[in-house]
């Protein structure tokens, strides 16, 4: 049985829902807290976590009267306790405290801890059988098969919080799995959609951070510019909805109004539309199986006027093609894809490589890892973390060579 409910059975959510937000001070966390703020009568905050932002975490804890808060940096525990002195709010720090936050008895958990660090706390929430709004990519990209198996066995409900996957989740409710022919994930095309390949190669950090539609964190904005984020989303969709690579298409849609579509066997295509605002998919997750009042601007199609679509250009944006290759290779290759991309993006931000070298480093790392015969099924979180570490080391070792080729 899938942990993602493809048919949205209408079981009314009654009473006050207890919620925990892992990654409360990040961009996804900000959107989540904004929605909670708008409906205080519906939600009780159980636990909140942050990476290092003690001031922001303490402010939210006081505002929402959280019962437990945790900061990932152990050195910040005394600072957190001082900020919450006299409140009676329990405090923790370090990786174990983040896991403890996930283990606390909340009905609904937003899993928005970035990176591989989010895997273990998200699994802790899954193991309780909670409703988990999944915003952490690594759970699926690095550990998709066993993550979804574990969620199904625990009776957890996985609610996709990413805009594209949430769109597919909503559209898939219009039919049965055996009636599906393919899903279509939309991509804005990013800031370099119309740029020539030579110009993309030389793009600066400031240019890569100028996304035309979405307001996001630095890493995901750069991933959008390279279309690596769309590659990650293809991988995620495969595990979330049990799809083969051939059942997942990507189309460039510059207006970012249609977020995802599903084609069924009768050739009907069901699409989900909305303003480009992360509060819309998060609101869907927060209210599911019901709907709550959203905070995004209403969609005005007459004002938008035109919706356009283009095929993705794999030559100018090779990162998307590499995602399909990693998905077909299996046995940890998607973990390598993600890890190498993170190393490459960090190097680009540090001005150690050109923008165009991001995909080349990912490709070379994947090739080297496969040539070394490292492929093996991943059966637990520690397996995924080990492959992640190995791939990061391999990418770091290849970095000078890639940088030299581009200079």
Swiss-Prot record:
EC number of this enzyme: 1.1.1.267
Keyword Metal-binding: yes
Catalytic activity: 2-C-methyl-D-erythritol 4-phosphate + NADP(+) = 1-deoxy-D-xylulose 5-phosphate + NADPH + H(+)
Cofactor(s) named in the record: Mg(2+); Mn(2+)
InterPro entries associated with the record: DXP_reductoisomerase, DXP_reductoisomerase_C, DXP_reductoisomerase_N, DXPR_C, DXPR_C_sf, NAD(P)-bd_dom_sf
Keywords (A to Z) from UniProt: Isoprene biosynthesis, Manganese, Metal-binding, NADP, Oxidoreductase
NCBIfam families referenced in this protein's UniProt entry, alphabetically: Dxr (TIGR00243)
Enzyme class: oxidoreductase
GO BP: any one term: isopentenyl diphosphate biosynthetic process, methylerythritol 4-phosphate pathway involved in terpenoid biosynthetic process
Known function: Catalyzes the NADPH-dependent rearrangement and reduction of 1-deoxy-D-xylulose-5-phosphate (DXP) to 2-C-methyl-D-erythritol 4-phosphate (MEP).
UniProt binding sites for Mn(2+): 162, 164, 233
Organism encoding this protein: Rhodopseudomonas palustris (strain BisB18)
Chain residues that bind 1-deoxy-D-xylulose 5-phosphate: 137, 163-164, 188, 211, 224, 229-230, 233
Molecular function per GO: 1-deoxy-D-xylulose-5-phosphate reductoisomerase activity; manganese ion binding; NADPH binding
Name of a matching Pfam family: DXPR_C
Residues at which NADPH binds: 25-28, 53, 136, 138, 217
Protein name per UniProt: 1-deoxy-D-xylulose 5-phosphate reductoisomerase
Pathway note: Isoprenoid biosynthesis; isopentenyl diphosphate biosynthesis via DXP pathway; isopentenyl diphosphate from 1-deoxy-D-xylulose 5-phosphate: step 1/6
Family classification: Belongs to the DXR family.
